[in-house]
């Protein structure tokens, strides 16, 4: 994306308030153009006071400086008041749009598929969101206040100076040419460098976020010094990339300041000569010195504008790239709200591949009636989790159809489909908020009584009541203030509170002790009645009473039946059951031997 197209996209993000933005920009243009009247009045006053009335001064002739001075004061006060009003409105608009775009970005990334978040560091997404919206704010504010006015005021100033005195105007044109050539050279030199700088910033953010997210690992393996040194190394590479960019722009500042001084001195020198020849007045010399000062201000604004666009471009490109990411799964234009489902689920010849080559699911077909419990069994990577991900449309299959209550799930809105599905993940996911807030994720309007009932059914009420703040206890970042079993019980309570017709349990009792697991299984048996439940199981003891067990291998269902039927067949499931039984027996024997030895 070129700088021009990038800047155009920045202005498009003004959205519904773009019209107000253009009004502010045009107002600033008019105010910037009006500033040219001040040097003209100044020069005219000097001419009047010196008794040398010049022609073509754009001001009616007068022999008294007071009317001109009064006009200057009135005009100056008016422009100051208008400038303050426009600046205030510009600030408010830029702040409003920054918050609006930040919220839109946040909403957008939350809707992107899990596959996107799996491959993108959360620290990078936060950095892109904050730096991107800050860059947008600066660009908008610059557009409202300076960019548009600075560029177009040059178009007014140069012809005006030609009209007043073309000989002195030549010096202003030379100054413009020097600025243009120098700026073009520096932009060409630093364009790629700034992209490298932003890449190093991203690495710095990602590395710091990675270490902070794994503090326990860093401390337990005594990696503090190593991680700090790693951050120093990234910081060093960042400085190495940044210094050449700063040096080039420092050179621009030095040369432009020198050009400014030379131009002013040249105006005086040429002006004195022309005055001696009767080709200009003292007032015009003063006027052109003021013109030169204004021109320098405008040129510096243009240079700063180009510099800012160049500096912000990598951040803006990252931000817009994320904003333009299209979710692989989204609602169709004709998608409907399915309401509350009964729980009938059908997979019909479903196939799916992550990379388009090796199938993760191949020709999967089965039907789950309302109230059925379907267990999915198999080795890691066999396709169990992928099948469930397809059910709640984390992905769409390349072929085949998945139906709920006879409706293709692709014809149902994502929100209504997912409202009907409750999920208990193997790793409990909790917000850094109170226990009550975490439970209300399942039902935002849940009453305190409903919270207590759900917690009680999930065997969580006891530890909640033991805490000092009860349901107001903060769970900590990712639930770190709670034990693994406590987090999992809250996750189960949240799913029960949602009361969905379809329930997914991804080894939901894996983090619980044997006593709590036994209690929880009784509660789950009661809750699962009348619901279609899918259980991703690794411990076969948890699926003893499943309506049907699907045994996965390399994306295919190789066996299907009840627990007893599959064991009787002596196939893959029976081998897995025997292996787990032998492991459990070995563990029991080892524990018994240890106990006997102590006796």
From Swiss-Prot:
Keyword Transmembrane helix found: yes
Residue spans crossing the bilayer: 22-42, 68-88, 146-166, 168-188, 254-274, 276-296
Catalytic activity: [(1->2)-beta-D-glucosyl](n)(in) + ATP + H2O = [(1->2)-beta-D-glucosyl](n)(out) + ADP + phosphate + H(+)
Function: Involved in beta-(1-->2)glucan export. Transmembrane domains (TMD) form a pore in the inner membrane and the ATP-binding domain (NBD) is responsible for energy generation.
PANTHER family xrefs: ATP-BINDING CASSETTE SUB-FAMILY B MEMBER 10, MITOCHONDRIAL (PTHR43394:SF1), ATP-DEPENDENT PERMEASE MDL1, MITOCHONDRIAL (PTHR43394)
Oligomeric and partner information: Homodimer.
GO terms under cellular component: plasma membrane
Sequence positions that bind ATP: 378-385
Subcellular location: Cell inner membrane
Family classification: Belongs to the ABC transporter superfamily. Beta-(1-->2)glucan exporter (TC 3.A.1.108.1) family.
Name of protein: Beta-(1-->2)glucan export ATP-binding/permease protein NdvA
Cross-referenced CDD domains: ABC_6TM_NdvA_beta-glucan_exporter_like
Keywords: ATP-binding, Cell inner membrane, Cell membrane, Membrane, Nucleotide-binding, Sugar transport, Translocase, Transmembrane, Transmembrane helix, Transport
Domain remark from Swiss-Prot or TrEMBL: In NdvA the ATP-binding domain (NBD) and the transmembrane domain (TMD) are fused.
Record-linked SMART domains: AAA
Cross-referenced InterPro entries: AAA+_ATPase (IPR003593), ABC1_TM_dom (IPR011527), ABC1_TM_sf (IPR036640), ABC_transporter-like_ATP-bd (IPR003439), ABC_transporter-like_CS (IPR017871), P-loop_NTPase (IPR027417), Type_1_exporter (IPR039421)
Enzyme class: translocase
Domain ABC transmembrane type-1: 21-311
Gene3D superfamilies found in the cross-reference section: ABC transporter type 1, transmembrane domain, P-loop containing nucleotide triphosphate hydrolases
Source organism of the structure: Rhodopseudomonas palustris (strain ATCC BAA-98 / CGA009)
Lineage of the organism: Bacteria, Pseudomonadati, Pseudomonadota, Alphaproteobacteria, Hyphomicrobiales
GO molecular function, one term: ABC-type oligopeptide transporter activity
Enzyme Commission number: 7.5.2.3
Annotated ABC transporter domain residues: 345-579
UniProt membrane topology term: Multi-pass membrane protein
């Amino acid at each position: 994306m070129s700088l021009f197209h990038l800047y155009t996209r920045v202005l498009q993000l003004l959205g519904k308030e773009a019209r107000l933005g253009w009004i502010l920009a045009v107002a600033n243009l008019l105010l910037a153009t009006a500033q040219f009247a001040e040097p003209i009045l100044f020069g005219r006053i000097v001419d009047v006071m010196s008794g040398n009335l010049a022609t073509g001064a754009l001001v009616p002739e007068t022999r008294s400086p007071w009317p001109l001075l009064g006009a200057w004061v009135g005009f100056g006060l008016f422009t100051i008041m208008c400038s303050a009003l426009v600046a205030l409105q510009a600030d408010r608009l830029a702040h409003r749009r920054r918050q609006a775009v930040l919220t839109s970005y946040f909403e957008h990334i939350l809707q992107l598929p899990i596959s996107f978040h799996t491959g993108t560091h959360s620290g990078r997404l936060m950095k892109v969101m904050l730096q991107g919206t800050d860059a947008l704010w600066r660009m908008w504010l610059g557009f409202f206040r300076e960019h548009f006015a600075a560029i177009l005021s040059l178009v007014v100033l140069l012809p005006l100076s030609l009209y007043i005195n073309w000989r002195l105007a030549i010096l202003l044109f030379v100054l413009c040419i020097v600025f243009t050539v120098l700026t073009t050279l520096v932009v060409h030199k630093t364009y790629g460098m700034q992209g490298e700088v932003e890449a190093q910033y991203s690495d710095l953010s990602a590395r710091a976020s990675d270490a902070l997210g794994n503090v326990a690992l860093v401390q337990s393996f005594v990696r503090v010094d190593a991680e700090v040194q790693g951050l120093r190394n990234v910081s060093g590479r960042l400085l190495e990339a940044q210094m050449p960019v700063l040096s080039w722009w420092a050179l621009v500042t030095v040369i432009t300041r020198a050009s400014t001084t030379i131009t002013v001195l040249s105006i005086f020198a040429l002006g004195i000569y022309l005055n001696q020849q009767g080709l200009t007045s003292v007032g015009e010399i003063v006027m052109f010195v003021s013109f030169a000062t204004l021109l320098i201000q405008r040129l510096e604004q243009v240079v700063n504008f180009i510099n800012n666009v160049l500096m912000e471009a990598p951040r803006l490109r990252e931000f817009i790239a994320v904003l333009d990411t299209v979710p692989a799964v989204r609602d169709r234009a004709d998608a409907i709200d399915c309401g509350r489902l009964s729980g009938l689920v059908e997979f019909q010849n479903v196939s799916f591949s992550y990379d388009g080559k090796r199938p993760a699911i191949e020709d999967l077909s089965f039907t789950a009636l309302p109230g059925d419990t379907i267990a999915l069994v198999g080795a890691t990577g066999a396709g169990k989790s992928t099948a469930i991900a397809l059910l709640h449309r984390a992905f769409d299959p390349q072929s085949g159809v998945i139906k709920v209550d006879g409706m293709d799930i692709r014809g149902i809105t994502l929100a209504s489909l997912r409202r009907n599905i409750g999920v208990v993940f193997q790793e409990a996911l909790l917000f850094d908020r109170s226990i009550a807030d975490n439970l209300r994720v399942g039902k935002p309007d849940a009453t305190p009584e409903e919270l207590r009932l759900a917690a009680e059914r999930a065997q969580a009420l006891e530890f909640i009541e033991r805490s000092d703040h009860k349901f107001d206890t903060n769970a900590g970042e990712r639930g770190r203030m709670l034990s693994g079993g406590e987090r999992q019980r809250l996750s189960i309570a949240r799913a029960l509170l949602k009361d969905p017709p379809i329930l997914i349990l991804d080894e939901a009792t894996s983090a619980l002790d044997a006593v709590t697991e036994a209690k929880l299984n009784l509660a789950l048996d009661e809750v699962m009645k009348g619901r279609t439940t899918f259980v991703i199981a690794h411990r076969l003891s948890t699926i003893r009473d499943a309506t049907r067990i699907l045994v996965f291998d390399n994306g295919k269902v190789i066996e299907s039946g009840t627990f007893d039927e599959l064991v009787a067949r002596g196939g893959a499931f029976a081998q897995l059951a025997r292996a787990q039984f032998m492991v459990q027996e070995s563990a029991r024997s080892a524990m018994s031997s240890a106990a006997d030895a102590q006796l």
